[in-house]
C-alpha cells in the first residue's frame, strides 16, 4: 500500500488521480495510482526504469491517447473535471497542460516562429511580438536570442533549445507544465540553467517533472512521488506508487523501506 501524505494541505489541488490503472493492450503498466498534484509547486516522479513515471505523466495531458493499445481505468481530475470524460477535447487538455520532452525538439522554424506558431493555431489575437518576448524572458532565453529571432531554432545549443521548448510551452498559456527528464540530454551548466528556471516558473505554473536524477529531484521539487516496479508471473512488469510526500521527508525520513533503499542508492 502506497503512503500518500499531503503535507501541503493548504495548497489547492490541480490534478487528482483516483484508482488509475493503465493498460497497453492486455499488459497492465500502472496499477492503483492515487495522487494529488498541488498548485504552483514542483512535483517530482522518481523510480527505476519501467515503473511508469512517464506513462503517468502522459496521462495528465492525454498524450497516451496517441498509442493505439492504450487504455485507462480510473479517473484523472483537473480542477474537479474528469479529463477522460467523453465530452473532453484532448487538444484543449494539451493546451492547458503543456509538455517538455526528454530531448529538445524545436520546430524547424525561426526562433520567433517556434514561439508564435502554437499561439497562432490556438487563436491568439494579441500582440505577437510582446508574447514572443515575454515567453522567451520567462524561459531565461531572451537576452541570448533577441538579436537573432529570425535564425533557426535548430541553430541554438542543446540547453538553449530546451529553454526554447519551455518558452514554446509557456506561449500557449498553460496552467501546468509537464517535464519528462528535461535535462537528461544536457550538460551540467545547461542543466543548472533549467533547474533555476524551474524554480522561477513555479511562481506562475504547476510543474510535474520526471527525473532519474535523485539529486535533481531533491534540488528542484517540493513534493516527490517514488514509484517502483514488480514482476508478474508471466514476465511482465507493473508500476505502482510506493510513497508520496514532501521532498524533504522522502529523502531524509521516508516511511517505506523500499523508498529508503532507493534514495540511498541500494537499488535502482
From Swiss-Prot:
It is an enzyme of class 7 (translocase). Pfam families: ABC_tran. SMART domains: AAA. Keywords: ATP-binding, Cell inner membrane, Cell membrane, Membrane, Nucleotide-binding, Phosphate transport, Translocase, Transport. GO terms for cellular component: plasma membrane. InterPro entries: AAA+_ATPase (IPR003593), ABC_transporter-like_ATP-bd (IPR003439), ABC_transporter-like_CS (IPR017871), P-loop_NTPase (IPR027417), PstB-like (IPR005670). PANTHER family: ABC TRANSPORTER I FAMILY MEMBER 17. Part of the ABC transporter complex PstSACB involved in phosphate import. Responsible for energy coupling to the transport system. The complex is composed of two ATP-binding proteins (PstB), two transmembrane proteins (PstC and PstA) and a solute-binding protein (PstS). This is Phosphate import ATP-binding protein PstB 3. The gene is pstB3.
